[in-house]
A protein has these predicted regions:
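A short SAM/SAH-binding and catalytic strip from SAM-dependent methyltransferases
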Residues: 51-66
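A short acidic, Gly/Pro-enriched loop at the edge of an enzyme's catalytic core
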Residues: 41-53
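A short glycine-rich, Lys/Arg-flanked "PGG" loop and its adjoining helix->strand segment in the class I
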Residues: 66-81
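Short alpha-helix
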Residues: 116-140
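Class I SAM-dependent methyltransferase SAM/SAH-binding core
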Residues: 1-41
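Core SAM-dependent methyltransferase catalytic element
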Residues: 133-135, 143, 148-164
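A structural alpha-helix within SAM-dependent methyltransferase catalytic domains
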Residues: 18, 69-73, 127, 131
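Conserved class I S-adenosyl-L-methionine
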Residues: 81-110
Length: 164
């Protein structure tokens, strides 16, 4: 069977995930870890390299995503797959500063009590995180919701290439 390591910066989110997945606790190791802290990320290492890694709608919430991509590359086996989804930088962050990384505040879920901070990165910056860490992009999807023609989300499949 698969061995799964799930992490989040928030202990509250980890507690909710453990409760939600209580019947799988013997198959999932839940950890509190900061995606910008290489030491914490590398502590997630198991006996063998991981075959796959997934980040669902988190990259835009991370101040500096470089440590995450660097560590995912280190933790994956050669040929391993990293799939991540994030806000579409062309259509969600409507800004005249598209090429310049910056933060901004917005609502994620209708009715939330206050705006949250997001970190805008251009497509070339997002792809550079992959390329600079030994990944090739072998899949790319732009997802829209509610019949809209403009996509809200990008889903990237990156494959770790063998370095030798």
């Amino acid at each position: 069977g698969a061995r799964v390591v799930a992490f989040d910066y928030s202990a509250n989110m980890i507690a909710l995930a453990q409760k939600r997945q209580s019947r799988y606790l013997d198959h999932i190791r839940f950890c509190v870890a900061d995606a910008t802290d290489e030491e914490q990320l590398m502590a997630l290492r198991g006996e063998k390299p991981f075959d796959k890694a997934v980040s669902n709608m988190a990259v835009m919430d991370i101040t500096d995503a470089a440590p995450l991509f660097r560590c995912v590359s280190c933790l994956l086996a050669d040929g391993g797959i990293f799939v991540f989804a994030t806000q579409h930088p062309c259509f969600v962050t409507l800004t005249d500063r598209y090429l310049t990384p910056h933060s901004y505040y917005d609502i994620a879920i209708e009715g939330q009590p206050q705006k949250q901070c997001y970190y805008h990165r251009s497509l070339q910056d997002i792809f550079a995180l992959c390329f600079d860490n030994g990944f090739v992009i072998d899949g790319f999807l732009e997802e829209s919701f509610g019949g809209k023609e403009k996509p809200d989300v990008i889903i990237v499949r990156a494959k770790k290439i063998a370095r030798g």
